[in-house]
Amino acid sequence: MPKTLNKGQQAAADGFFDFLFSGDKEMIISGPGGVGKSFLMGYLIDEIMPRYEKMCSLLNQPVKYRDVHMTATTNKAAEVLAQATGRPCGTVHSFLGLKVTDDFSTGVSKLSKTNNWKVHQRIILFVDESSMVDTTLLKYIREAMLECKVVFVGDHCQLAPVKETKPPVFTQGLPMYVLTEPMRNNGQPALMAICQQLRDTVETGTFNPVQVVPGVIDLL
């Protein structure tokens, strides 16, 4: 049975298909938790990649991208993504062959190349929780991706990495598809409303009082 996408997911899926044939090297899928980002990533691999290969065949073009790798910025995020999609997933640092060293005097983690560092060619790399990609990590990702496609997945309203004012990925002017339709809490309108209210606060800087809904949202 084919998987069903909502309107925002479908727009992102169509955008990903076009992205594979475009000259763009990077794109973004953004949205809060519970809007189906992990589901969409699985769909792009299971449904859009085969469609891309068929189109290449019809156009008598070589299939440029076959290998797809799923990564995340933290071990926990990688574990969650692996469970959600049923696919192998590790940290982007491990995939690139980077060593993370914590500098407790500054609170900033330092990155350095290990013997496992390599430059990849003609792959598709997903980077989940990409709001945590700082300027240095973004530089390494770009250095390691030769004729590759990178899909940054995350939430542009999340906190920026340490010592950054905004998540660098979201300041690059990259093509971005924003998912807004809640899939996880869609049976609880009150929870959906407060989540949206908090996001609006991040984006506008204006905070409105939380509306109490007995049994769902209570003040302690």
Positions of PLM-derived features:
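Walker B catalytic acidic pair
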Residues: 128-129, 154-156
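Inter-Walker segment of RecA-like/P-loop motor cores
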Residues: 68-121
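The conserved Walker
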Residues: 33
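N-terminal pre-P-loop "Q-motif" helix
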Residues: 2-21
